[in-house]
Regions:
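C-terminal catalytic "cap/lid" subdomain
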Residues: 1-72, 76-104, 108-326
Length: 326
């Protein structure tokens, strides 16, 4: 089963866009050109019969600009005030863009209690199902104006985690995180020239978490650990997840066409299928790793280069075979 086959069957899709994807880095203002392109992509997915849920960052940034604040809010109260001002303005922009295509949208603001409290969760799920049945595009954000860290239910902490929880809540088939990174590497590519891009993750284990910046890693790629944690939530719930760079918003089209864009984290179901199909190749690569570990008297960089050469000699890009391989 290749990537195109996996993605062709996706019907209920959650797409998260980060602040850096929909704003200008220099000014913090909304990038209306990119946001309009994003909306057109979503409309096209809807026209294909897909159910689409958007998780959108940006409320705090929009509120900060509206309030004339030059710097990011330093206190929780200031952040929540910015979110309260910005959320309505952000939704107004989305609504105006979607209205050009006669597409209805709905604002859905969640707190952690919406997921962890049984009754709240039930109501939230029913709301999403009904909105999708009515052909409405839900636009989701955390209710930052009232979310807290310390009380019984806490908060999501970041929109990657929020998006994963939404995907789990609605039984989504696919979660796409559009962010400021290409995907996942075996090491920080800014520090290690031998870092390899990982196209597909079959299984999330401790070594992969270390690559993402866990306690065992010396080369964490900022923000990647939250994305791996999001992948654990989504894939455990049966959704595949893709991390891709939001600089090119049209990458969403390429993803849905099955092109090798970003890093694909396979759900447990698809992971087992892929595991079986790739077993012979993975066995070969494990032998190469074993020989690599036995190497003595060579620098780490030299050994890594040698391992990569062995990969290429064997005719495979084994970064994509990740899952108890590295």
């Amino acid at each position: 089963m290749d990537r195109k086959q996996i993605l062709d069957e996706k019907n209920r899709i959650v797409i998260k866009v980060g602040t850096t994807t929909i704003t200008y880095e220099e000014t913090g203002n909304i990038n209306l050109d990119k946001l309009e392109k994003f909306v057109r992509i979503l409309i096209n997915l809807r026209n294909k019969g897909k159910e689409v849920i958007v998780v959108s960052s940006g409320a705090v940034g929009v509120g900060r600009k509206a309030l004339g604040m030059e710097h990011k809010p330093e206190t929780e109260a200031a952040k929540q005030a910015c979110a309260a001002v910005g959320q309505g303005r952000l939704m107004m922009i989305y609504e105006k863009l979607f209205n050009e295509y006669s597409q209805l949208t709905a604002q859905v603001l969640l707190t952690k209690e919406s997921i962890t409290n049984k009754e709240c969760r039930k109501n939230a799920r029913q709301t999403f199902d009904e909105l999708l049945r009515m052909n409405v595009v839900p636009i989701v954000n955390e209710n930052d104006a009232i979310s807290v860290d310390e009380l019984a239910y806490g908060n999501f902490g970041d929109n990657d985690t929020l998006a994963a929880n939404v995907a789990e809540l609605v039984d989504a088939d696919l979660l796409i995180l559009m962010s400021d990174i290409e995907g996942m590497y075996t090491a920080d590519p800014k520090k290690n020239q031998n870092a390899r891009f990982i196209h597909t993750v079959v299984e999330i284990d401790e070594s992969l978490e270390a690559m993402a910046g866990g306690s065992a890693s010396d080369f964490g790629t900022g923000g990647m650990m939250t994305k791996v944690n999001a992948a654990k939530i989504a894939t455990s719930a049966g959704a595949d997840m893709i991390i891709a760079n939001g600089d090119n918003i049209y990458a969403i089209n390429d993803i849905m066409a099955g092109k090798k864009i970003g890093t694909l984290f396979l759900s447990k179901e698809h992971g087992k299928l892929m595991e079986n199909e790739l077993a012979p190749e993975r066995a070969k690569f494990r032998r190469q790793v074993k020989n690599f570990k036995k190497s003595e008297g060579k620098s780490e960089e030299h050994k890594t280069t040698e391992l990569i050469q062995n990969e290429e000699h064997m005719g495979g890009n084994y970064g994509k075979l990740y899952g108890n391989t590295w």
